[in-house]
């Protein structure tokens, strides 16, 4: 099954401010991912091409990286995930930046069931939480995207 999953968020800050957060991805002081809610992203050599790691049961390798622009990860697990996911940081103008997460893959085997029934929902909630955390770094009134009942149920199961 072909899967393309895209999340975008407009941040009303210059790209340089957002890049400061982006550069902490997968570090002990990760300012992008909501590590208080989700497993932390860990990479054996940080944001460098060839670095291996993941978060929770999802494993991947840094396939491409351009500091301050994007990082792309190639899936290695779970079995049946054939493709990549990436974060992009795009300046829309001098004071507005778009952060984007793209997942592009084909699923096979058991992943034909696990992606649409569970992983997709958890993935979407994780990215929403990450984008909330990133945006909240710049806001006085914090934003919180609510989890669906299905996400709450899946998290309760685990």
Where on the chain are the PLM-derived regions?
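Hydrophobic ligand-binding cavity/cleft-lining segments
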Residues: 1-43, 155-158
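Short, surface-exposed coil-to-beta transition loops
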Residues: 4-6, 55-60, 81-86
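A short, structured loop/turn motif at beta-sheet edges
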Residues: 12-16, 63-68, 88-98
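Hydrophobic pocket/interface hotspot
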Residues: 18-28, 62, 71-73, 99-101, ...
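Short beta-strand segments that buttress and anchor functional surface loops
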Residues: 46-54, 72-78
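A contiguous binding-surface segment within folded domains or other stable secondary-structure elements
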Residues: 61-63, 68-76, 80, 86
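Beta-strand/loop substructures that line and gate deep hydrophobic ligand-binding cavities in soluble
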Residues: 77-136, 140, 145-149
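A short, hydrophobic/aromatic-rich structural module that often spans a beta strand
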Residues: 146-158
């Amino acid at each position: 099954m072909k899967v393309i999953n895209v999340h975008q968020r407009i941040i009303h800050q210059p790209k340089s401010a957002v890049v400061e957060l982006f550069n902490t991805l997968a570090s002990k002081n990760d300012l992008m991912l909501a590590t208080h809610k989700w497993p932390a992203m860990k990479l054996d050599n940080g944001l460098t091409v060839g670095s291996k790691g993941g978060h929770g049961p999802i494993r991947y390798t840094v396939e491409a990286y351009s500091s301050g622009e994007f990082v792309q990860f190639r899936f290695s697990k779970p079995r049946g995930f054939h493709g990549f996911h990436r974060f992009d940081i795009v300046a829309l103008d001098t004071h507005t930046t778009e952060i984007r997460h793209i997942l592009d893959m084909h699923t096979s085997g058991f992943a034909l069931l696990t992606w649409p029934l569970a992983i997709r929902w958890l993935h979407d909630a994780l990215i929403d939480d990450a984008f909330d955390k990133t945006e909240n770094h710049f806001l006085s009134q914090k934003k919180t995207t609510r989890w669906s009942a299905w996400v709450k149920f899946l998290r309760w199961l685990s």
